[in-house]
Amino acid sequence: MINRRQFSVLAGVAAAGTAVAACAPMATSTPSTPTPAGHTTFRSFAQVDAGLLNVGYAEDGPADGPPVILLHGWPYDVHSYVDVAPLLAARGFRVIVPFLRGFGSTRFLSDSTFRNGQQAAVAEDVIALMDALDIPKAVVAGFDWGARSADVVAALWPQRCRALVSVSGYLVVDLVANRAPLPPRAEYGWWYQYYFATDRGEAGYRQNTHDFNKLIWTNASPTWAFDDATYDRSAASFTNPDHVDVVIHNYRWRQGLAPGEPRYDDLERRLAAKPAITVPAITISSDFDGPAKDGAAYRHLFTGRYEHRVLDGIGHNVPQEAPRQFADAVIEVAGWS
């Protein structure tokens, strides 16, 4: 899920209390008719050694097409893009959709590698994948963890990022800002992060991963009538043996409760300065973003050609809930560069 301080830092503390209904532990809207996905799988899947990982990824489109890398979030997987990929492939793009570390068929190459979920580690995985696939430059797009990783790639490696599509805007984690408390209603919205901070939370997530993540799906997208088959296709990725360790570390690291690795210290120092994103970019917001929906608060952090789009009636999983709109953003921003 997104940065716990987004609503207060970006939209003001007073407004933050109303912004978190989508991720609060009790949903206020329950869809009555499940909506099946248009597609259920990808053209093909592959594996490649890349950096610290053996990365599993879905692919579509011509091998010589302009590359687009689509990054999923938590608790989701590559199937968030199952309807986006063929739309982009039909326009001639080479589409790569990797399972992030801790998801699906992606595995650590060494048992001794720390199961790190910090932002610099996940973003560096993207660069390693591009190197392994001999992709010098790509359009990078994502939501949730994937948007954060895409933002980091665009900010720290602009020479590798042709253009950017980021749901919820500028999501680079600010560890210092994360130390400050939010108003009670806003804190309530981030209940799962505090749950993960406890031994009980880690044990509970390990024991109930399937049902826990389905609850997050429902609460983050209260008007999306996904069916069980749609959820179960993604839920298979949560059985990855490293999934719980990576997820728990990610959220504890964000709260300053778990250290990152020294190898990423320089990257994190650069990210702490909130570097501007200079590449062409389209940001997308949805109902999940609450008072930050207009994107005004992070507009100054995008200094290249830029557009912000608002999708009303859509929850957090934008590419799966609104695949045409997401694909259109990728197609348009690619044309700017």
Predicted region positions:
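C-terminal segment of N-terminal export signals and the immediately downstream linker at the start
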Residues: 1, 22-51
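N-terminal secretory signal peptides and thylakoid transit peptides that target proteins
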Residues: 1-15
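Conserved acidic functional residues
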Residues: 26, 73, 144, 320-321
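Flexible "cap/lid" subdomain of the alpha/beta-hydrolase fold that forms the substrate-access gate
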Residues: 36-43, 52-55, 60, 67, ...
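Conserved HGGG/HGGXW glycine-rich cap/lid loop of the alpha/beta-hydrolase fold
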Residues: 60-107
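Nucleotide-sugar-dependent glycosyltransferase donor-binding/catalytic pocket residues
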Residues: 76, 172, 290-291, 316-319
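Catalytic active-site module of serine/aspartate enzymes centered on a nucleophile-bearing elbow/loop
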Residues: 307-337
